[in-house]
């Protein structure tokens, strides 16, 4: 008997794609194909794993005008493309983690009476998911409290899936020889970088290094050269644009300084990493602040708005944390309590239930 076919619609950022890949890895009984957008991250991560179909698409601007008309035309074309794909290749259902591609995929599935299942990682669901949820068979949630933001939908708290490497015993940091007794700070600004965070950390770094602390600073592609040129060489200050082996890095970290994207927070929770969160101030509906607040309430993190934070305040806060191992231990324990390590399996179970019934 041939395997049932499942179309995964996930595009754009790692926050959409990595959870979808984790769920796909749990669904070996399905024949999976992927629907995305040209020139986005899925074009690097998906080929070689699953067949990838792409269709041009951009977000709808709030204000009507030429760009809005073009985006609306693309959305309708993407809907027709998705509908033809689902029909001609006899897919049994659609799974989406949100983003622009979710709308045409879910609406196409509904028009063919096929089940659509979604997953929302953020505490405050995105507008696309909030609008589409009523037409989904079920919506998996990364945070239980997210159900209050979604009306007319069947929801289930499943946690946010993380990459499989976060669920195995981490290997040693072969490329970063941090002494066992040395505190390690990991700084993460996102894939494109966070200039404000990078600048504040650069100001604080000399004092931290004098105290014997190690720093792994992930600048993002757009900020690497500026940070590298403005920072003196020091064996305990390692600067990279990206770092692929995040599971062992975060497992070794004593403290993370980070934005508050949902996928990153899930990785911090699974690894039990205390964090100082600086939400991206221009995120849609300030949803990163809502994410960060959930970890603060659980005792797993501290939160500062970018506008309110300065290098001296960052320095004092980090020193207070690293000088108090008991506080860090409590934060780490709180993070692990909030984590859902088997979120990928739980979400895959939800997909199975919806597609088969």
From Swiss-Prot:
Cell wall formation. Catalyzes the transfer of a GlcNAc subunit on undecaprenyl-pyrophosphoryl-MurNAc-pentapeptide (lipid intermediate I) to form undecaprenyl-pyrophosphoryl-MurNAc-(pentapeptide)GlcNAc (lipid intermediate II). This is UDP-N-acetylglucosamine--N-acetylmuramyl-(pentapeptide) pyrophosphoryl-undecaprenol N-acetylglucosamine transferase. It is a peripheral membrane protein. It catalyses: di-trans,octa-cis-undecaprenyl diphospho-N-acetyl-alpha-D-muramoyl-L-alanyl-D-glutamyl-meso-2,6-diaminopimeloyl-D-alanyl-D-alanine + UDP-N-acetyl-alpha-D-glucosamine = di-trans,octa-cis-undecaprenyl diphospho-[N-acetyl-alpha-D-glucosaminyl-(1->4)]-N-acetyl-alpha-D-muramoyl-L-alanyl-D-glutamyl-meso-2,6-diaminopimeloyl-D-alanyl-D-alanine + UDP + H(+). Its EC number is 2.4.1.227. Keywords: Cell cycle, Cell division, Cell inner membrane, Cell membrane, Cell shape, Cell wall biogenesis/degradation, Glycosyltransferase, Membrane, Peptidoglycan synthesis, Transferase. PANTHER family: GLYCOSYLTRANSFERASE (PTHR21015:SF22), UDP-N-ACETYLGLUCOSAMINE--N-ACETYLMURAMYL-(PENTAPEPTIDE) PYROPHOSPHORYL-UNDECAPRENOL N-ACETYLGLUCOSAMINE TRANSFERASE 1 (PTHR21015). The gene is murG.
């Amino acid at each position: 008997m041939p395997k049932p076919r499942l179309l995964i619609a996930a595009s754009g950022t790692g926050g959409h794609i990595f959870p979808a890949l984790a769920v796909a890895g749990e669904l070996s009984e399905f024949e999976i194909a992927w629907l995305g957008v040209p020139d986005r991250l899925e074009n690097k991560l998906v080929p070689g794993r699953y067949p990838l179909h792409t269709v041009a698409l951009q977000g709808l601007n709030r204000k009507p005008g030429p760009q809005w008309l073009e985006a609306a035309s693309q959305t309708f074309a993407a809907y027709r493309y998705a509908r033809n794909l689902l029909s001609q290749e006899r897919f049994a259902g659609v799974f989406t983690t949100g983003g622009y591609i979710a709308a045409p995929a879910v609406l196409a599935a509904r028009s063919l009476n096929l089940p659509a299942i979604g997953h929302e990682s953020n505490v405050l669901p995105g507008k696309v998911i909030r609008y589409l949820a009523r037409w989904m068979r079920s919506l998996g949630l990364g945070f239980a409290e997210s159900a209050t933001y979604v009306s007319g939908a069947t929801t289930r708290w499943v946690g946010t899936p993380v990459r499989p490497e976060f669920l195995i015993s981490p290997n040693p940091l072969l490329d970063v020889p941090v002494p066992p007794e040395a505190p390690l700070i990991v700084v993460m600004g996102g894939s494109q970088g966070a200039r404000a965070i990078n600048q504040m950390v650069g100001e604080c770094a000399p004092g931290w290094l004098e105290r014997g602390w190690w720093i792994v600073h992930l600048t993002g592609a757009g900020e690497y050269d500026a940070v590298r040129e403005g920072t003196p060489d020091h064996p305990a200050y390692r600067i990279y644009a990206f770092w692929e082996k995040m599971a062992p890095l975060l497992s070794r970290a004593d403290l993370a300084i980070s934005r508050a994207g949902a996928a990153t927070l899930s990785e911090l929770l699974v690894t039990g990493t205390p964090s100082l969160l600086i939400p991206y101030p221009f995120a849609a509906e300030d949803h990163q602040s809502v994410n960060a607040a959930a970890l603060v309430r659980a005792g797993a993190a501290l939160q500062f708005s970018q506008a309110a934070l300065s290098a001296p305040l960052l320095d004092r806060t980090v020193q207070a944390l690293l000088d108090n191992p008991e506080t860090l231990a409590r934060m780490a324990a709180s993070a692990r309590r909030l984590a859902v390590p088997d979120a990928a399996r739980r979400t895959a179970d939800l997909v199975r239930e919806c597609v088969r019934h």
